[in-house]
């Protein structure tokens, strides 16, 4: 399958791997027939690899709605995005759509997807964050000329999603990896174990992700391994993470934080890459 060069992340997402791709690419397996990414996020790894048989998933229904809209009706999505204005008034009006459940539920899938992209492009630091009620709560970013529509990227992603055999799911990671065929490869990029008490960010989903969840994910990886399926997982290089994955191959890689509310704190931190293959 021809690689679509312009296919790249449409939204900025916490933990995005665009800046880490150069270090990650040599660590992926050479051959596999099916690819699964249960925490798709912005999709930087997906678009770098562009495999032919793919399952992408995320628990965040709004994010998955973006992928589905791009795949199903990119023309309508572009037209809807062109109607938004980069003003404080428009931003807070659109952000407030989810405060009224009756109103929000009447929106089309295109409206909902366009809203996510618009808010992501115009909110402060591109930080997708929801409160405990699942309502988007990042403030206006005051950017002079954000690329709200980004038509070339949208059309390239649409082409990839319709050229490859792509299944889009909105479920738990554990459900997403069920029944994978032999010679599958799974890349897992979950919410990270916090490196400090104040470093935790799981606001991309109202439910959060704690250490019990990390252990459950480790158990899922053990099951993948027992089933003969190759996996690779990214996480922070905390002692806890290195301990629970000590049965597998661990590589330490330095990574730059792509999203932080304080610019001076966007420094380098160590991450782990866990694999069940050489």
Language-model segments: which ranges?
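Conserved proline-anchored active-site loop of SAM-dependent methyltransferases
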Residues: 24, 35-49, 53-59, 117, ...
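Conserved S-adenosyl-L-methionine
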Residues: 27-88
């Amino acid at each position: 399958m021809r690689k679509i060069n312009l296919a790249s992340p449409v939204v900025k997402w916490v933990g995005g791997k665009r800046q880490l791709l150069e270090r990650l690419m040599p660590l992926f397996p050479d051959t596999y027939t099916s690819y699964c990414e249960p925490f798709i996020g912005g999709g930087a790894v997906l678009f770098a690899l562009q495999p032919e048989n793919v399952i992408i998933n995320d628990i965040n229904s709004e994010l998955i709605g973006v992928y589905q809209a791009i795949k199903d009706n990119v023309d309508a999505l572009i037209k809807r995005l062109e109607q938004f204005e980069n003003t404080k008034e428009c931003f807070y009006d659109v952000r407030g759509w989810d405060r009224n459940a009756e109103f929000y539920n009447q929106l089309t899938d295109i409206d909902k997807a366009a809203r996510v992209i618009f808010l992501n492009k115009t909110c402060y630091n591109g930080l997708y964050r929801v409160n405990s009620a699942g309502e988007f709560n990042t403030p206006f970013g005051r950017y002079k000329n954000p690329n709200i529509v980004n038509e070339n990227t949208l059309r390239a992603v649409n082409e990839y999603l319709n050229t490859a055999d792509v299944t889009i799911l909105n479920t738990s990671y554990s459900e997403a990896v069920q029944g994978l065929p032999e010679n599958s490869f799974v890349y897992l990029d979950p919410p990270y174990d916090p490196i400090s008490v104040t470093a935790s960010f799981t606001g991309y989903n109202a439910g959060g992700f704690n250490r019990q969840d990390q252990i459950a994910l480790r158990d899922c990886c053990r099951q993948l391994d027992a089933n003969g399926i190759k996996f690779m997982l990214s996480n922070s290089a905390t002692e806890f993470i290195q301990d629970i994955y000590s049965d597998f191959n661990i590589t330490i890689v330095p990574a730059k934080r792509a999203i932080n509310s304080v610019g001076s704190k966007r420094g380098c931190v160590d991450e782990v890459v866990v694999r069940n293959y050489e």
